[in-house]
Amino acid sequence: MHPKRKKRLLIVLAGLAVVAVASGLILNAFRSNLVFFHTPTEIAAGQVDTDRVIRVGGLVEAGSVEREPGGLRVRFVITDTARSVPVRYEGILPDLFREGHGTVVQGRIGTDGVLAATQVLAKHDENYMPPEAADAIQRAGETVVQ
């Protein structure tokens, strides 16, 4: 094999090796940062790893919200109407957080089966529309109708 051709081949192989290693590192980073969504039924059935950060969605069970007096600690239960998951959270809850309403909680399941939440997201009704948007649509409708 000609020395120039051999050198080119080595450079191409080295480049491919670098691309392969970089691709492997990127895929590994993506996999470790994925947050999977689960239901309370899946958690109760033991289908969830306790060492991963997960998201759990459902309704806040009526009568389950317990706030620590003078503190930010809250305990509540999320249900999908079939099974329930107890949640522990320390922080300020969203304004739309209410019993009987939808919520998505992110955190880790402890060995005791309680979800230690790091983030609580309150879901609003799919028919909800901010007042400003409703006013704008109404004004647009009036100008079109005229």
UniProtKB/Swiss-Prot annotation:
Cross-referenced InterPro entries: CcmE (IPR004329), CcmE-like_sf (IPR036127), NA-bd_OB-fold (IPR012340)
Domain of life assignment: Bacteria
All ranges on the Periplasmic side of the membrane: 30-146
Any single Gene Ontology cellular-component annotation: plasma membrane
Function: Heme chaperone required for the biogenesis of c-type cytochromes. Transiently binds heme delivered by CcmC and transfers the heme to apo-cytochromes in a process facilitated by CcmF and CcmH.
Ranges of the Cytoplasmic topological domain: 1-8
Primary localization: membrane
Alphabetized UniProt keyword annotations: Cell inner membrane, Cell membrane, Cytochrome c-type biogenesis, Heme, Iron, Membrane, Metal-binding, Signal-anchor, Transmembrane, Transmembrane helix
Organism: Laribacter hongkongensis (strain HLHK9)
A UniProt-annotated Pfam family: CcmE
Membrane-spanning segments: 9-29
Subcellular location: Cell inner membrane
Annotated Gene3D superfamilies: Nucleic acid-binding proteins
Residue sites binding heme per the record: 124, 128
Gene Ontology annotations of biological process type: cytochrome complex assembly
Protein name, entry field: Cytochrome c-type biogenesis protein CcmE
Similarity-based family: Belongs to the CcmE/CycJ family.
SUPFAM superfamilies attached to this UniProt entry: Heme chaperone CcmE
MF term (GO), any: metal ion binding
